[in-house]
């Protein structure tokens, strides 16, 4: 990552940003985040994940396991990060090949003790729940990702963002705000 830093700083300076933007369509490798303490962040999850994957007969049977995390700090917004802000990794999905992405119950059971996405609701996905999310009843920074099914081909997901997050996106990105929306 040391070789990437000068190039990233130049690109960030030209864009007037503290960090590279990410969107719902963009996966970014941690090395692309430049000056953050990557080893510490990765090790916070790597050691307990390795233990789970090695000790569980279920996980040892998979060909490949990929984890998906959100990289963020208290001042992060829409994939932009403040350099001085302390960052963390939050686990939100595990892909076990060839099965697919784990279902929500298995994810919470196996990984809920790690820094992971907070469960705000369990139950049927209803219009009333969606409206509660939009009005920020659950006090989230952006909104929620709803998941259901057992996992793999049976898994479904959908995002619901808060009205206040939508307003922040419109202020920050004008006509491109929908690139960062649900």
Language-model segments: which ranges?
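Core nucleotide-handling region used for phosphoryl-transfer chemistry
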Residues: 1-182
């Amino acid at each position: 990552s040391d070789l990437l830093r000068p190039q990233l700083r130049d690109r960030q300076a030209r864009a007037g940003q503290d960090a590279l933007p990410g969107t719902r369509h963009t996966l970014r490798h941690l090395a692309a985040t430049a000056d953050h303490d990557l080893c510490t962040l990765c090790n916070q999850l790597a050691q307990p994940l390795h233990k789970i994957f090695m000790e569980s007969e279920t996980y040892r049977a998979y060909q490949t396991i990929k984890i998906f995390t959100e990289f963020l700090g208290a001042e992060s917004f829409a994939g932009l990060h403040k350099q001085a802000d302390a960052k963390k990794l939050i686990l939100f999905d595990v892909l076990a090949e060839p099965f697919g992405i784990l279902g929500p119950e298995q994810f919470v059971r196996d990984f809920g003790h790690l820094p992971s996405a907070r469960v705000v609701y369990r139950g049927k996905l209803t219009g009333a729940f969606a409206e509660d999310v939009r009005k920020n009843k659950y006090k989230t920074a952006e909104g929620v990702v709803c998941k259901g099914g057992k996992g793999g081909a049976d898994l479904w997901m959908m995002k619901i963002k808060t009205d206040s997050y939508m307003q922040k996106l419109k202020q920050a990105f004008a006509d491109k705000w929908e690139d960062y929306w649900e």
